[in-house]
């Protein structure tokens, strides 16, 4: 029996930073979906959706320049789930010194977010023309130990996510951010690792549940 292949593209939150493969949201999603599905994790720690340069130097850590990005396209998946943007919502501020690294000041180039994200979408469409594509809205940034990551920057990207979705009516939204935000603040804080940026196993399970409900709304409703 041919399995439905789901390819998860993203950053460290997809990869499973700090928790290991079996606690990552793609792994937990595979458990929810069952044997008829194959879920492939192609997340890369620190990656940005934007692929930019400044004075000939690469800014951030562009996902499209990573080997796992090329592997994700080569998978020819039936479904692609893209969860990027957390690392684009940063200003490059040093954690100790009063200094901003311009090569990490991604939010200063936020007006280029849409075109760069669209390039990823177009590459997926070219690699897998019949695939369904889902865009995830990233989880909130809590009181992050790294000063450069701030929720207000993620909020600045929200209109751009809306613009991307409006320009691509065939793409569906998975609102991970809303899934966290609708909980009480204490409950939300309990879903993160100590760094305030990366969800812990419980938070990653919430992401998996949210993705599952988007992919399989009927089955999820029956389980509820």
Predicted features along the sequence, with ranges:
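A short helix->loop->beta-strand "cap" motif at the edges of active sites that frequently abuts
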Residues: 128-132
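Generic structural signal for well-ordered alpha-helices
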Residues: 69, 117-122, 158, 162
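N-terminal hydrophobic signal/anchor transmembrane helix of membrane proteins
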Residues: 69-88, 168-194, 204, 211
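Histidine-centered active-site loop/cap adjacent to the catalytic His
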Residues: 29-32, 191-224
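Short hydrophobic segments within beta-strands
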Residues: 9-10, 136
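Conserved SGNH/GDSL esterase-like catalytic core that processes O-acyl groups on lipids
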Residues: 3-7, 13-111, 115
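Substrate-gating cap/lid alpha-helix
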Residues: 139-178
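Short acidic/His/Gly/Ser-rich catalytic and metal-binding motifs that mark active-site loops
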Residues: 48-51, 89-94, 143-145, 181-188
């Amino acid at each position: 029996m041919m399995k439905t292949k789901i390819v998860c593209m993203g950053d460290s939150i997809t990869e499973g930073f700090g928790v290991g493969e079996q606690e990552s949201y793609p792994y937990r999603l595979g458990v929810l979906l069952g044997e008829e599905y194959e879920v492939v994790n192609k997340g890369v720690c620190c990656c940005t959706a934007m692929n930019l340069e400044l004075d000939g130097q690469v800014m951030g850590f562009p996902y499209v320049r990573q080997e796992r990005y090329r592997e994700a396209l080569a998978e020819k998946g039936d479904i692609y789930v893209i969860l990027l943007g957390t690392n684009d919502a940063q200003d490059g501020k040093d954690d100790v010194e009063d200094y901003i690294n311009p090569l990490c000041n991604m939010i200063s180039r936020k007006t280029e977010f849409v075109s760069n994200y669209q390039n990823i979408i177009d590459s997926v469409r070219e690699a897998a023309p019949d695939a369904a594509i889902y865009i995830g809205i990233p989880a909130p940034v809590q009181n992050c130990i790294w000063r450069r990551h701030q929720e207000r920057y993620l909020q600045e990207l929200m209109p751009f996510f809306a613009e991307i979705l409006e320009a691509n009516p065939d793409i569906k939204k998975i609102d991970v951010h809303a899934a966290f935000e609708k909980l009480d603040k204490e409950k939300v804080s309990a879903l993160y690792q100590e760094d305030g940026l990366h969800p812990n196993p419980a938070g990653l399970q919430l992401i998996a549940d949210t993705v599952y409900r988007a992919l399989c709304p009927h089955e999820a409703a029956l389980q509820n």
